[in-house]
Every structure is written in C-alpha cells, then in structure tokens.
C-alpha cells in the first residue's frame, strides 16, 4: 500500500560527490529521505551521464530497488551552457540533443519528471529572437517528452523570463500539453516581487513538485535556512490548503562541505519542523 506521508527528497548536490549511486541512496535512506533528485548540469562530468551504457543505467535501477530510495526526477540545468534560445544554430542543436538524451535516459531508468531551467539564453544577451527560439525549442522538447511519457516541468527561476508561476503558466497555456507542467522553487519565487501565496494558488493543478530553499533578494543559492526571506510555514500551508499532495525537495549545495551529511541533517530537521507547524507532517 502506498504511504500517505508527504514525500521528502534531497538534491544530489547536497550529498558527497561521486558516481556511486548505491552509496548515495544508502546515505539518503540513513538521513530519512524518500528520494534523491539527480543533477545533469553544464559540466562535462554530469553531462556524460546521458551517454551511460546499458549496464550503468541498470546499476542505477538496481540501486533504487535495493535501497527503496527513488530517483524520480532530474534537475536538467545543462541548458545554461547549451540554451534552447541560442542564436547559434550549432549550440541550439546541442541543447535539443541534450534534451533528447535526457528524455531517453529518464525513460530507461524510471525518472518521471525532468525539471527544466527557464533560460532562453544565460551567458548571452536575450532578445525577441532568443525568446522565440526558446518557445519553439520547448515545443519540440515537449513533443519528444509526450512520446516517451516523461513530464517536463518548468522551474521558477533566478531570471526575469521565468521568475513567477504566472509567467510559467503562460508557457503551459501556449504549449497546452499534459506532459509540460510546473516545478516551482519557493526560494526563487520569494526572492522576486511576487505575491507568493497567490502565485502558489494559481499554479495548483500544474505543480508536480516543489523545491525548498531559502533566498534573499538577488541571492539565490547557499542562503542558510532561516536567514532569508522565505515564509516557509505560509507556503506549506497554502500548498496544503490548495490540495497539493506531491513531493518536496530540499535543494542544497553542500557536496563540498566538510561534513555534507551533518549539513543535510540540520537542514532536514529545520524544514520538517516548519512542515509540522503547517500540518504537512507529524511533529518529531
């Protein structure tokens, strides 16, 4: 029987670096998490995962089966380097090929949701043409995802093009496809001039997962929990009252810390205490 508790996961980059997924999932289980989100970023090392052999893919599936800790989602931030909105046709083609490989990888290993980075371009200057190319690239990507039955979910970003649920919903309506949904980050959402609770309510019915982190205006990474502007309890209450029952993912970048597991455990306890106050989980 499926558990009725709220699934709580941890981002791969919060845990010690390395390519042994059995070790990573065992550690996540020890720390009390239900799942781990894989990162495929713009580095060559993580991009190489999309070219894993059949045996390497099966090893990940086996690690999930052995530990009971799932890998249901992928954070695909590689499109910073190879953006779908690039005016360089070769770069854009690489971006689409990365998308194709990511969808195939997800299909092979059981990943259900690929979180997309909402950048038309990242290292270049955006303009009307980059946005048009980005829209067309999303359409092509969602067509691929539909055939594979893999959900593409747009993150709410540290970038003006996609810094609110309202803006992401515009793309959802434009694409009008059940395999394109939203994956908001309550930290990014709170760092901009948004009515955060109204935005969360507006996204209900399209939100497939939620990133949990703290932020400050203009500071989107590595803000310790409790030191930023995010009203976690209100966000959790709003999501619960709106009927959201999906997963929450603690997003951290502690893989190079002296003791990543201790950092993660501290963050886990802090977040779960706010979840308990909001009635999402039972108090410890």
UniProtKB/Swiss-Prot annotation:
Keyword flag Isomerase: yes
UniProt-listed InterPro entries: L-Ru-5P_3-Epase, L-Ru-5P_3-Epase_Enterobacteria, Sugar_Epim/Isomerase, Xyl_isomerase-like_sf, Xyl_isomerase-like_TIM-brl
Keyword Transport belongs to the record: no
Pathway the protein contributes to: Cofactor degradation; L-ascorbate degradation; D-xylulose 5-phosphate from L-ascorbate: step 3/4
Biological process terms in GO annotation: L-ascorbic acid catabolic process
EC number: 5.1.3.22
Gene3D superfamilies with a match to the protein in the record: Divalent-metal-dependent TIM barrel enzymes
Reactions that this protein is recorded to catalyse: L-ribulose 5-phosphate = L-xylulose 5-phosphate
Inducing factors: Induced by L-ascorbate. Repressed by UlaR.
An example molecular function term from Gene Ontology annotations: L-ribulose-5-phosphate 3-epimerase activity
Top-tier EC class: isomerase
Keywords in alphabetical order: Isomerase
Pfam family, one: AP_endonuc_2
NCBIfam families linked to this entry: hxl6Piso_put, PRK13209.1, PRK13210.1
Record-stated family: Belongs to the L-ribulose-5-phosphate 3-epimerase family.
HAMAP family: UlaE (MF_01951)
Physiological role: Catalyzes the isomerization of L-xylulose-5-phosphate to L-ribulose-5-phosphate. Is involved in the anaerobic L-ascorbate utilization.
Name of the featured protein: L-ribulose-5-phosphate 3-epimerase UlaE
Organism from which the protein derives: Salmonella paratyphi B (strain ATCC BAA-1250 / SPB7)
Organism ancestry: Bacteria, Pseudomonadati, Pseudomonadota, Gammaproteobacteria, Enterobacterales
């Amino acid at each position: 029987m499926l558990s009725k508790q709220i699934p709580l996961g941890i981002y791969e980059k919060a845990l010690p670096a390395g390519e042994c997924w059995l070790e990573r999932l065992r550690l996540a289980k020890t720390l009390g998490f239900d799942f781990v989100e894989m990162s495929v970023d713009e580095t060559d090392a993580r991009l190489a995962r999309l070219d894993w052999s059949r045996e390497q893919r099966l090893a990940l599936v086996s690690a999930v089966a052995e530990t009971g800790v799932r890998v249901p989602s992928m954070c695909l931030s590689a499109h910073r380097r190879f953006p779908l909105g690039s005016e360089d046709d070769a770069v854009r083609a690489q971006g689409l090929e990365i998308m194709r490989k990511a969808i195939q990888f997800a299909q092979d290993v059981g990943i259900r949701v690929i979180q997309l980075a909402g950048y038309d371009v990242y290292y270049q200057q955006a303009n009307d043409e980059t946005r048009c190319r980005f829209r067309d690239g999303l359409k092509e990507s969602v067509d691929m995802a539909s055939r594979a039955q893999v959900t593409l979910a747009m993150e709410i970003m540290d970038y003006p093009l996609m810094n609110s649920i309202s803006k992401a919903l515009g793309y959802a309506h434009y694409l009008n496809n059940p395999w394109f949904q939203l994956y908001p980050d309550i930290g990014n959402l709170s760092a901009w001039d948004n009515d955060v609770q109204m935005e969360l309510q507006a996204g209900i019915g399209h939100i497939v997962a939620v990133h949990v982190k703290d932020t400050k205006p203009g500071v989107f990474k590595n803000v310790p929990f409790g030191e930023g502007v995010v009203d976690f309890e209100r966000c959790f209450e709003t999501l619960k009252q709106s009927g959201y029952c999906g997963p929450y993912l603690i997003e951290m970048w502690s893989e190079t810390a002296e003791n990543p597991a201790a950092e993660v455990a501290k963050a886990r306890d802090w977040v779960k205490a706010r979840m308990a106050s909001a009635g999402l989980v039972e108090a410890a």
